[in-house]
């Protein structure tokens, strides 16, 4: 009987040890930090959500202006970024190469997204609230998974700002100043509409896209070099 008891105890321990050694299910942890005097951030490890609370302009990444952003420690984990109201501009390189970032929620009064802000966010496919944006910086959304992007109120699009993205269709507003190679290498871009009032189609603007249809208004007086190069499917 004692022998059977010992055998039972051994079996019980054998079953219990893996449970004891197993790492506990990760509890929700919220990491917080500050950057300069006007910005606070938090990261929720359970929801994989980053929240940015900033009054005024966000600072730029150290790659650009020598400032270290603590939230970049979570660049591989973050899937969503929420910007609270009060932010006027998103800093240069602020979320560059957040490779698992899928969606962002922008504040209603955001005006500027600076250079390289979301460049290399290869899974980014959803943006909420971007009607107030006026300027998109150089490479701001290059190499992302964005299929849709409203340019309705945009006044300035800098070089390569949406290059190598997954855009399917685009409409360019009348009063927008457009940099070079803005849609370069958007291999899924099949249709583009340029509103009356646009005067220039910039260098390499639609280079290497899948463009099949484009509407060019009579207001256009200049088409830049290589604007439609490698658009092998372009019909009209």
Can you describe what each PLM-predicted range is?
Residues 10-19:
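Bacterial N-terminal signal peptides
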Residues 40-41, 93-94, 127, 160, ...:
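Short, T/G/N/S-enriched strand-turn elements that build extracellular solenoid repeat scaffolds
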Residues 29-100, 117-119, 184, 205-206:
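Surface-exposed repetitive/solenoidal architectures
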Residues 31-33, 109, 119, 159, ...:
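Secreted/extracellular small peptides and ectodomain modules produced from precursors
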Residues 91-94, 114-117, 137-140, 158-161, ...:
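Consensus positions within tandem repeat domains that build extended binding/scaffold surfaces
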Residues 20-31:
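Sec-dependent signal peptide cleavage junction
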Residues 1-11:
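Bacterial N-terminal signal peptides that target proteins for export
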Residues 49-57, 76-89, 99-112, 122-135, ...:
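Structural signature of tandem-repeat unit edges
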């Amino acid at each position: 009987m004692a022998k059977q008891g010992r055998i039972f105890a051994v079996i019980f321990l054998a079953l219990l040890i893996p449970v004891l050694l197993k790492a506990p299910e990760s509890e929700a942890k919220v990491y917080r930090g500050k950057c300069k005097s006007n910005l606070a951030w938090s990261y929720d490890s359970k929801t994989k959500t980053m929240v940015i609370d900033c009054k005024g302009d966000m600072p730029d990444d150290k790659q650009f202006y020598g400032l270290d952003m603590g939230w970049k420690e979570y660049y591989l984990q973050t899937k969503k970024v929420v910007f609270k109201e009060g932010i006027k501009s998103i800093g240069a390189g602020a979320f560059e190469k957040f490779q698992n970032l899928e969606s962002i929620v922008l504040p209603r009064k955001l005006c500027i997204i600076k250079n390289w802000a979301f460049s290399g966010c290869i899974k980014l496919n959803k943006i909420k609230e971007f009607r107030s944006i006026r300027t998109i910086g150089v490479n701001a959304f290059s190499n992302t998974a964005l299929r849709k992007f409203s340019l309705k109120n945009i006044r300035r699009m800098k070089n390569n700002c949406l290059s190598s993205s997954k855009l399917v269709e685009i409409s360019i507003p009348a009063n927008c100043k457009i940099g070079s190679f803005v849609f370069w290498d958007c291999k899924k871009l099949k249709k583009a509409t340029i509103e009356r009032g646009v005067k220039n189609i910039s260098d390499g603007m639609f280079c290497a896209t899948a463009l099949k249809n484009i509407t060019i208004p009579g207001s256009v007086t200049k088409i830049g070099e290589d604007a439609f190069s490698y658009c092998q499917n372009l019909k009209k």
